């Protein structure tokens, strides 16, 4: 069986991580293996109490990529890359660093919600998990749904790319 990489796309508070939890449960009922690599969890494991949210971002990104590559190399059936990936540049930055097997399927799972919904959900968060409202509003303005126009001719080495959008 081939690995499927599911790259989450959505602003903070859109419901990406909640969607991932539900999808993991569904996939595991089918007796397939899953691995969720959350950039937030990677960040929490690296940052200290003295650090601010975006401190050590290079180290966080490198570890995020390392964990995704490791899961794909292990042959996990479905690997989730749980982070915002709101722009073509952020998606290309990630995918350009991954070791893609030609048999690996890439799916962009896009969670597109109104900014008001994301702000309401974010207001319920505490500590480092709570993002400034201004940052969420700015990210919503920079948000774009992946399109074939942004894919390189090589498809980053993936055999198949699909985009699914949820509202």
PLM features: what roles do these ranges have?
Residues 1-3, 72-73:
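Phosphate-binding P-loop
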Residues 18-77, 124:
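Conserved substrate/cofactor phosphate-moiety recognition/catalytic segment
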Residues 4, 33-35, 78, 105-107:
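Residue-level recognition of the N-termini of beta-strands and the immediately preceding loop/turn
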Residues 55-106:
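Glycine-rich phosphate-binding loop used to anchor ATP phosphates in small-molecule kinases
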Residues 2-9, 14-17, 22-27, 100, ...:
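Conserved GTP-binding G-domain of TRAFAC-class P-loop NTPases and closely related GTPase folds
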Residues 50, 54-61, 84, 129, ...:
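Flexible, glycine- and charge-enriched loops at secondary-structure boundaries
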Residues 16, 44-47, 88, 118:
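Conserved protein kinase catalytic core
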Residues 41-43, 85-86, 112-117:
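Conserved nucleotide-binding/hydrolysis micro-motifs of P-loop NTPases
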